[in-house]
UniProtKB/Swiss-Prot annotation:
InterPro entries: DEAD/DEAH_box_helicase_dom, Helicase_ATP-bd, Helicase_C-like, P-loop_NTPase, Y'_ATP-dependent_helicase. The keyword Thylakoid does not apply. Its EC number is 5.6.2.-. The gene is YRF1-2. The lineage of its organism: Eukaryota, Fungi, Dikarya, Ascomycota, Saccharomycotina. GO terms for biological process: telomere maintenance via recombination. Residues 1140-1283 have a biased composition (Low complexity). Residues 1284-1307 have a biased composition (Basic and acidic residues). This is Y' element ATP-dependent helicase protein 1 copy 2. One of its GO terms (cellular component) is nucleus. ATP binds at residues 696-703. Signal peptide: none annotated. Residues 683-860 form the Helicase ATP-binding domain.
Length: 1681
């Protein structure tokens, strides 16, 4: 409806307009920067106007109004500027675009826009002359002459989507969550041709943001020169402004409709559904307590070093102590006073008691320890933010939460003297004018907030010291208390911020960023199957307060309206929803308003129940002496927080519980598959049988046998049961988590969480793999279960439930893994209520042996019939000694499994080729189906994936991948409907449940019967299974200790033999779904077989090879799709142009009489395209050149029955094509180039004298073009049919057409016309960067010599070096990041502009420290999506950058080129300030080897240790054999996450540091590994016991940790005077490997000296080991100085 108001359909762009608009897309970064600078300058000048009383009404200030020129933060101006870029471009080209035709028809004498003057005034990087621009804006607002028409068109154009705007921040994530886009609106010119791709309209939310930006620009620009601002008056303003406000109001209303989330009430779970995602009380509590656990874990790290008072101690001693008064007026004051904090209300005697003391030597407080304190407190800030977010209930917007302050003029954190809870008075609003809201925290969260302010923040202040100066002045902070705010230093600002604001990132010098905050949202709660984003969570919290917590509307109208206002809904909400006329909290008295809000918070606190889980005394307090005594008594053990669990009434088990569970899971129509399934569920749930084994056929529903009992157990209120499920492989883990978490009936989490953190009290089922089951840590956790539960929950009603082992036959059949299962025998099985073992391939013999192998008694002597439900007579012996009851459903049903699958055994010449044929045929018949291919080796898996991905989307898995990668890929294949084929070894055959799976192909000649059954069993509802073997190569090789491979012959008979079923060999019914029998197959499977057979016959008749199948099957990944000139691609080794097959193309024209001529390049082995005309009787004869690999194409005249035969020139290896035109007597000329193996075809139309290369036959309305790429082994054929109004390129380009649905760029005449600007731009860039056809790098471009480049070379710089969002956009050309039709890459380009932009960014990083580089990234934000524009921006400073590098890195080049040698004796500061600089080379080496020996012995995580001296254990790191496992070990302990959040590594991409361990440093790695022998010789020479020096990955971890350790680097650069700062990791690694002269003039590597300095920092003495926390502003004493 809004788009009708904007009249979008009348905005028509013609061909010339498109040519002009291409300038904007080619230079978008430039126009982004231009618009930002113009708005910034206008706003700056407008804000400097004298005070103006003019106001305008807003939604929040409807009565008094808000100032017209609003105060905007720089970040807001930046985003507004980027949104304005397209419209600024329109204004600068108003004379060239046809949409401004009304303006262009101005009469003589009417005012015109001088676009040339505008460009001169505005286009400099920092525009200062904006007077003329301001006058134009005023004239447009006043509709002077026809200038109003310009603004009218620009406003209507706001409804068009000119492409993606800037990203980042909470609001942008919310935008991306809105999926209801408007339909595409076509734009047609006067010739009926769709010409412009700018037809996808803006969403209402984006349109509203665009109008916000336009309004801000109009107001600011007009205010620069206007005498007054009456034109913006609501009553007497100009008509244009009133029309803009009408537009804005309509858009705002539609935005509200669009943003209405699908929220439905779910009473059964005490929650709501938000966009299909369950959000309830358990979701909130799970998230909250996970954050609390993270806070406690970080507190434990501090407690290891200090005697930390607990949260309970501080709450009891101070917060709930009635001797401490917190009576003070609420709200901030205008002056910054020293006592404007509740800290000053705490008596001095309590301040001294709470001070933490060092556990270690009281005289040691090292720089390393201070750094550890700072980092840990920064990390626990984020979980505390989330705790507050959920505790207040009525949600905050993120900026509101971010600006919580406990002191200063913006203070909003108070302590209520009556309830002793924390109260938050906030008044944040988008317009900054909302009345304050009061929200009260519960007791538990209040204790944590109070503890953070009184203890942790003061620790952090002392650890940072008085010299801390990371914060700069920013508009969000109030700098008061200084006579001249402009003279305030960064140290002053940092001091104010630390003593005022709660949520800081002290490492970066900023408030906690949204990107850091939202990381928790992506991972928590761990048991939630679907995570909500921040906007959905906000709406969900409002809905919970409205439906689950809120009062009844009929009786508590004002109470309910208060709840809405506390969620920051506008005053219109009260009127529209509740019938209250303009209700607001100002409508009632101040006391009533406070009471209403306090009662709303109390309702939320009671509903959420956080205080009931936290044991603290509200009536009694502890004296100071008691706490002191407690500290002395707890010198070795800190006091734990006590929790109690609510006592719940006991509820007996009932057979109806299983039915109710099934209805919860599957709906009210749930029924059991058969009676066997019902009785087995009851046996597991009701009977006392301690151990049960079940064998059921694949696809029977074994998961439901334990899933339903688990749901029934979880519904009981008397006891909390915690169960465990284990599967054999990691690939099953993701599938199990997805299946068991559906509908939110169970709280599911990985077993690794239990092993690392213990039971969280929320999770019902932990899921893991066999390796977890066998781990010592899991065994220890189970052994100590009762003690842990008693200490943690203070109750015994949390018990171990079921131990479930799926596919347990692997314990016996997986011979190669049996050594890994040894730890299972140590598990205390008796601790579980019941053990359940499930398998589809475990006959009695296999089951019995498998159970005995893990330490159980085995099966009972007699199998139990399914109908027997006897209670056990004697269970006193325990589960481990009690025999397991076996339920064999296969024997009970007497049906051979897998009869529903059609099994085919084929012997073929080539297994991969035959498999590809089958897959392509399947996807032609069933395009949405999926398939699994089982290969025999890991190499074969990767080869198949590499060669098949050109045809369809492939996921491949094998055992060498890391666990996380396996889980990720499996989940992707199961959930992503576009993935077609899963290729893997036999580990993909067990337990995976995949919808749309219709085919399984097995290429492994050594599969045994179990692996065969498991693989075929993936076809749940029928399908096809092919066993492909090579002819004359099948050999049943019996591997030692394992089942023999399957034999050639009837598969069904082998299955019967395995299960012990009656043989039917030679009898009726022998073949079930095999050997051609289709009797037992479903109708759908039979139909699929018949369709496959018909397609095979059709292909055989047409004699089509596998590579000539219709290209509609050849589904390419979207990331591989690129246009003609996108030939340089650093992200992929292969580039397929025009979505065509790289090796062959086949085109059949069934509707037109077209002649297709293909052109073959002699340098490639290409196959030409044959054209078949079904409407004529003409015969096409193909002739083959015996001397080349090319196939000629014959051309047949449609209008005659003659046959045209192609001739072959054997001597020149050339192919000639003859073409005859029956309409004329002219014959085409054939031309052969004898010097090259090329085909030259010339066609002459008898009606004209012109000769064309791409021939066009006007009588057939067909155009045929042939394209040859001389640098690749590909032939690209593009065919366009002018008589059909559709895209003629149907060879896999459907998805491209979906992205650009209305741009027909294949129209040849239009293509040439529309690409003129692109060609011109391409030529300019090629001239500006002439060496991109070679292996050029940006240092060459800057002018460095080859010997300098050798040492400054930027290796390891790729797309992952760039931060997220910088040159990393998807769906665009990978070489230049532009739309494909505007691609400026050129054929033969080896180094793309995008790669050069990466390297240019790295060069800028070379010259800047962390803070300067962060500011630089903000400055170049207009170019984040435009690497070509950034290169232009970069090249302007080319000479300056070259000179700066020469100056800054002269010392580096001198050292790395060995022209200078570092000597420690030349460093005066080093000799005076460090003992290391007085050591001999021998002593430095001994210290180095000792450090590594200690790290190895204690299994300390290396990177973490050198980063901040934190001695975390990581055994897997030291046992890792390859880089992948090593990186996984680091991920498990959270090293990379900590690096990104707390160090400069956050300024690179998320994968950058991880990839340093894989491929980037091969040369340095080789050098280091060659030096290992020399290290051993040095150890022997030193007379020390030879110890293993670190392997490469550990050594690299050390250097990365030192590089990111800011404290260490500052110390090293201070002591070692010959070096300066380097900001790139490659330079740091090269520098660390140079040799230095020690005090005795012996040479040692610099990295050994680094380790010695690092060790010295860890043991530096400081005067006092106790934090001097004087809770006052004038404390000037810094600990350690």
């Amino acid at each position: 409806m809004v788009y009708t108001l904007f009249q979008v359909h009348t905005l028509k762009f013609n061909r010339k307009d498109y040519d002009t608009l291409s300038l904007f897309y080619l230079n978008r970064g430039y126009y982004n920067e231009l618009s930002f600078r113009v708005l910034e300058r206008c706003h700056e000048k407008a804000s400097a106007r004298p005070n103006d009383s003019s106001t305008m009404r807003t939604f929040t200030d409807f009565v008094s109004g808000a100032p017209i020129v609003r105060s905007l933060q720089k970040s807001t101006i930046r985003k507004y500027g980027y949104n304005l870029a397209p419209y600024m471009f329109l204004l600068l080209h108003v004379d060239e675009l046809s949409i401004f035709s009304a303006y262009q028809a101005s009469l003589p004498g009417e005012k015109k826009v001088d676009t040339e003057r505008l460009k001169r005034d505005l286009c400099p990087r920092k525009p200062t002359e904006i007077k003329y621009f301001s006058q134009i804006c005023n004239d447009m607002m006043n509709k002077k002459d026809r200038l109003g028409d310009i603004l009218h068109i620009i406003l209507r154009a706001c409804a068009l989507n000119f492409g993606a705007g800037p990203r980042g921040g909470a609001g942008d994530e919310e935008d991306r969550s809105i999926t209801n886009e408007e339909p595409i609106i076509p734009s047609v010119d006067e010739h009926g041709l769709k010409v412009c791709k700018l037809r996808s309209p803006n969403t209402p939310r984006r349109l509203r943001k665009t109008l916000d930006a336009v309004k801000a620009l109009l107001v600011s620009s007009c205010a620069c020169t206007a005498r007054d601002l009456d034109i913006f008056d609501d009553n007497n303003g100009v008509a244009m402004w009133k029309w803009i406000k009408i537009l804005y109001h309509e858009v705002a209303q539609e935005t509200a409709l669009k943003d209405s989330y699908r929220i439905t009430l779910v009473p059964s779970s005490d929650g709501v559904s938000v966009c299909g995602k369950l959000f309830n009380r358990e979701y909130v509590r799970g998230f909250y307590f996970a954050c609390k656990a993270q806070f406690d874990n970080l507190w434990e790290e501090l407690n290891d070093c200090f005697y930390m008072p607990t949260v309970v101690d501080i709450a009891s001693l101070i917060l709930r102590n009635r001797e401490v008064l917190f009576r003070e007026p609420k709200r901030g004051i205008d002056e910054y006073l020293e006592n404007d904090s509740f800290l000053q209300m705490i008596p001095v005697k309590y301040r001294e008691i709470v001070l933490p003391k060092l556990r270690r030597d009281t005289n040691k407080m090292t720089a390393a320890l201070k750094n550890k304190v700072t980092v840990a407190i920064d990390e626990l800030t984020v979980p505390l933010m989330w705790m507050i977010h959920f505790a207040v209930g009525y949600p905050y917007r993120y900026p509101e939460l971010q600006l919580l302050a406990f002191a200063g003029p913006q203070r909003n954190v108070y302590v209520d003297d009556t309830t002793r809870r924390i109260q938050l008075y906030t008044d944040y609003n988008k317009n900054g004018s909302s009345e304050p809201r009061l929200k009260t925290l519960d007791g538990l969260t209040s204790d944590y907030v109070f503890y953070f302010v009184t203890v942790l923040r003061q620790m952090q202040i002392c650890a940072l010291g008085n010299s801390y100066d990371a914060f700069n002045h920013d508009p969000w902070m109030d700098v008061v208390g200084f006579e001249d705010p402009d003279q305030v230093t960064n140290r002053d600002i940092s001091r104010i911020v630390l003593y005022s604001y709660m949520f800081l990132n002290t490492a970066k010098g900023c408030l906690v960023e949204y990107a850091t905050f939202r990381q928790y949202m992506r991972e928590l709660p761990k048991n939630a199957p679907q995570k909500l984003n921040f906007r959905e969570m906000r709406q969900g919290l409002i809905a919970l307060g409205r439906h689950c917590v809120g009062s009844r509307f009929e009786t508590d109208l004002y109470e309910s309206a208060t709840s809405e206002l506390m969620a920051n809904h506008s005053v219109q909400t009260g009127r529209n929803i509740y019938g209250v006329d303009s209700f607001s909290l100002t409508s009632v008295s101040g006391t009533t308003a406070t009471l209403l809000q306090e009662r709303a918070s109390e309702r939320w606190i009671q509903w959420l129940g956080l205080e009931s889980d936290y044991h603290c005394s509200f009536s009694s307090t502890r004296n100071a002496e008691d706490v002191v005594a407690g500290e002395a008594a707890s010198s070795d053990h800190h006091q734990k927080i006590s929790r109690v669990t609510r006592k719940r009434p006991r509820e007996p088990k009932s057979t109806n519980d299983i039915l109710v569970a099934g209805q919860k899971l599957f709906g009210s129509s749930f029924e059991f598959r058969d009676l066997h399934q019902l009785r087995l569920c009851h046996e597991i749930y009701m009977a006392d049988t301690p151990s049960v084994a079940v064998q059921a056929p694949p696809g029977y529903g074994k998961t439901e046998l334990f899933h339903l009992p688990l749901i029934a157990l979880a519904s009981k209120g008397d006891v909390k049961y915690v169960s465990f499920l284990f599967v054999p492989y990691t690939v099953l883990l993701a599938n199990c988590m997805i299946r068991l978490s559906r509908c939110g009936c169970l709280n599911v989490a990985p077993v690794r969480n239990f092993i690392e953190e213990g039971c969280d009290g929320v999770t019902d089922l932990y899921v893991g793999i066999y390796d977890d089951l066998a781990s010592t840590n899991f065994t220890d956790r189970i052994a100590a279960w009762e003690n842990i539960v008693e200490c943690t929950f203070r109750t015994n009603n949390v018990k171990l439930g079921y131990l479930i082992v799926d596919e347990f036959h692997n314990f016996e059949t997986e011979v190669y893994r049996q050594s890994q299962f040894g730890g299972i025998t140590n598990l205390d099985f008796d601790a579980f209520e019941k053990a359940i073992f499930l398998s589809g391939t475990a006959p009695e013999a296999v089951a019995d042996a498998a159970l005995q192998r893990i330490g159980l008694t085995g099966l009972a002597k007699k199998s139990m019939d399914i109908n027997e439900l006897k209670r056990s007579e004697d269970l006193s012996r325990g589960l481990s000694s009690y025999p397991t009851r076996m339920f064999n459903l296969i024997k009970e049903k007497s049906e051979v499994p897998l009869g529903h699958v059609h099994k085919i055994w084929k012997k073929v010449e080539s297994q991969p080729e035959e498999a590809l044929k089958l897959l392509l045929a399947l996807f032609e018949i069933e395009p949405e189906s999926k398939a699994i291919v089982v290969a025999s080796t890991t190499n074969e898996v990767e080869e198949l994936a590499c060669s098949w991905r050109k045809y369809f989307r492939v996921v491949w898995i094998h055992g060498k991948l890391g666990a996380a990668e396996k889980v990720s890929r499996t989940k992707e294949f199961v959930t992503d409907g576009s993935m077609r084929v899963l290729i893997g070894t036999k580990l993909v055959t067990e337990g995976i449940d995949i919808k749309q799976l219709m085919m399984v192909i097995m290429l492994d000649n050594r599969l045994n019967i179990i692996e065969l059954i498991q693989g075929v069993g993936r076809l749940r509802d029928g399908g096809l299974c092919y066993l492909l073997s090579r002819k004359n190569s099948w050999a049943a090789r019996n591997r030692k200790g394992e089942l023999p491979p399957i034999k050639e012959g009837c598969i069904t008979e082998q299955v019967r033999e395995f299960y012990g079923l009656e043989s039917k060999k030679g009898k009726k019914g022998q073949h079930v779904g095999c050997c051609g029998s289709r009797t037992d197959l479903s109708a759908d499977t039979v139909e699929l077989i018949e369709r496959m057979d018909r397609l095979a016959e059709k292909q055989a008749t047409a004699s089509m090879s596998i590579v000539a199948l219709p290209s509609s099957f050849q589904e390419s990944n979207s990331s591989d799709r690129c246009r003609k000139y996108c030939s340089s691609d650093e992200d992929s080794d292969t580039c397929i142009h025009g979505s065509a097959n790289a090796s062959t193309n086949a085109t059949t024209n069934s509707s037109t009489n077209a002649t297709t001529t293909a052109s073959t390049n002699v340098r490639t082995s290409a196959t030409t395209t044959a054209s078949i005309n079904v409407r004529t009787s003409a015969t096409t004869t193909e002739s083959t050149n015996s001397s080349t690999n090319a196939t000629t194409t014959a051309s047949t005249n449609v209008r005659t029955s003659a046959t045209t035969t192609a001739s072959i020139n054997v001597r020149t290896s050339a192919t000639t094509t003859e073409s005859t035109n029956s309409n004329t007597s002219a014959t085409t000329t054939e031309s052969t180039d004898s010097n090259t193996s090329a085909t030259t075809t010339e066609s002459t139309d008898s009606n004209t004298s012109a000769t064309t290369t791409a021939s066009t036959n006007s009588s057939t309305n067909a155009t045929t073009t042939a394209s040859t790429n001389s640098s690749t082994n590909a032939t690209t054929t593009e065919s366009t049919n002018a008589s059909a109004k559709e895209d003629a390129n149907k060879d896999g380009n459907a998805e491209d057409n979906r992205f650009h649905p209305v741009t027909d760029i294949n129209k040849e005449s239009y293509k040439r016309k529309g690409s003129q600007m692109v060609l011109l731009e391409r030529k300019k860039l090629k001239a500006q960067f002439p060496n991109t056809s070679e292996n050029m790098n940006v240092l060459q471009f800057l002018g460095f010599r080859s010997d300098e480049i050798k040492h400054l070379f930027l290796y390891g710089i790729d797309v992952y070096f760039c931060p997220e969002g910088v040159f990393t956009q998807y769906g665009l050309c990978k070489g230049c990041q532009k739309m494909f039709e505007l691609c400026v890459c050129w054929a033969g380009q080896k180094v793309s502009y995008r790669r050069m932009a990466w390297e240019a960014l790295a060069v800028e990083r070379m010259l800047r420290n962390d803070e300067e580089y962060k500011e630089y990234l903000e400055d170049i934000e207009p170019y984040h999506g435009d690497p070509v524009g950034y290169l232009k921006y970069f090249s302007v400073k080319r000479g300056e950058i070259y000179s700066q590098i020469q100056r800054n890195y002269a010392w580096y080049l001198a050292i790395t080129r060995r022209r200078e040698t570092i000597s420690v004796l030349d460093s005066t500061r080093g000799k005076q300030g460090s003992q290391v600089f007085r050591m001999s080379g021998r002593q430095i080496k001994e210290l180095y080897y000792k450090v590594w020996s200690n790290l190895r012995e204690s299994k300390t995580e290396v990177l973490q240790y050198f980063l901040n001296w934190d001695e975390k254990k990581c055994r897997e790191e030291w046992e890792a054999k390859d880089d992948t496992v090593f990186v996984e070990a680091l991920e498990k302990v959270g090293v990379f996450q900590r690096l990104r959040s707390m160090t400069s590594a956050g300024l690179q991409g998320p994968q950058y540091v991880k990839l340093q361990f894989s491929r980037h440093h091969r040369q340095l790695r080789s050098r280091y590994e060659l030096s290992l022998g020399m290290h051993l010789r040095d150890q022997l020479a030193l007379g020390v016991t030879p110890s293993k020096v670190p392997h490469w990955t550990a050594f690299l971890s050390m250097l990365i940790g030192l590089f990111c350790n800011k404290t260490f680097r500052q110390k090293l650069e201070y002591l070692l005077e010959q070096i300066s700062e380097v900001w790139l990791l490659p330079h740091w690694l090269d520098l660390a490997n140079v040799e230095v002269l020690a005090a005795d003039n012996t040479r040692v590597p610099l990295y050994m000296l680094m380790v010695a300095v690092h060790k010295e920092l860890d043991s530096d003495d400081v005067p006092d080991g106790r934090f001097d926390i004087l809770l006052c502003r004038d404390s000037s004493r810094e600990v350690g100085e």
